[in-house]
Amino acid sequence: MLIQAVTIFPEMFDSITRYGVTGRANRQGIWQFEAVNPRKFADNRLGYIDDRPFGGGPGMIMMAPPLHAAIEHAKAQSSQAAKVIYLSPQGKPLTHPKAAELAELPHLILLCGRYEGIDERLLQTSVDEEISIGDFVVSGGELPAMMLMDAVLRLVPGVLGDMQSAEQDSFSSGILDCPHYTKPLEFQGMAVPEVLRSGNHGLIAEWRLEQSLRRTLERRPDLLEKRVLIPKESRLLETIRQEQREIQS
């Protein structure tokens, strides 16, 4: 997989290309990265790529021509079709299913905005999709781009040492992950649940499912409204709800 970022701050991406599981996978050649600086495509000696907005208003707007040239340069680096994504609070929310969809693609170009935004004409002519990481605003698109990259790359075969890690993550199955424990057996008076030390894999699997459902019901009940429950899940969920009703009464 080739991922390119159109950014005026290429150095920011060192954190994902050099460190952790994504950095290791990059060194192993499982995925490749290139930062494309639109300043190199500016039509002025100083590399300005922004100007004042027509109609007035605060801040500066990134100009379409240098960004368009940077995107076209990025596309030319691969013979495979690229999907151009603009990281924007106005985009559709990034979800696990969307990350899984993007993980299947061979070439992504991530457009990282700065200042007050990007000329609308560039978005209409050169961007395939706008994606948001949440209902809040940050100073630029680089951090959202790296969050998207991390979510996507975890689902690319070979990036994680064990793909089961990705399969057990929160949201991968549509519900939140269960609690996890390791040594020591006791910490500040709290012991590891006995079932996890029993060696009974069937009981452990059922406990983890029950805990995932319990946590999802408490923290993200909206996820359960979207999920088609299998009979075992329905049974466990009804038991949890009955417990809650008894506590409240």
UniProtKB/Swiss-Prot annotation:
Primary site of residence: cytoplasm
Coiled-coil ranges from the UniProt annotation: none
Enzyme Commission identifier(s): 2.1.1.228
Source organism superkingdom: Bacteria
General function of this protein: Specifically methylates guanosine-37 in various tRNAs.
Name of the top EC class for this enzyme: transferase
Similarity comment: Belongs to the RNA methyltransferase TrmD family.
Keyword S-adenosyl-L-methionine: yes
A GO term for molecular function: tRNA (guanine(37)-N1)-methyltransferase activity
Keywords for this protein: Cytoplasm, Methyltransferase, S-adenosyl-L-methionine, Transferase, tRNA processing
Subcellular location: Cytoplasm
GO biological process: tRNA N1-guanine methylation
Subunit structure: Homodimer.
Taxon lineage: Bacteria, Pseudomonadati, Pseudomonadota, Betaproteobacteria, Neisseriales
Residues bound to S-adenosyl-L-methionine: 113, 133-138
Reaction it catalyzes: guanosine(37) in tRNA + S-adenosyl-L-methionine = N(1)-methylguanosine(37) in tRNA + S-adenosyl-L-homocysteine + H(+)
Name of protein: tRNA (guanine-N(1)-)-methyltransferase
Keyword Flavoprotein belongs to the record: no
Any single Pfam family the record assigns to this protein: tRNA_m1G_MT
Gene Ontology CC terms, in alphabetical order: cytosol
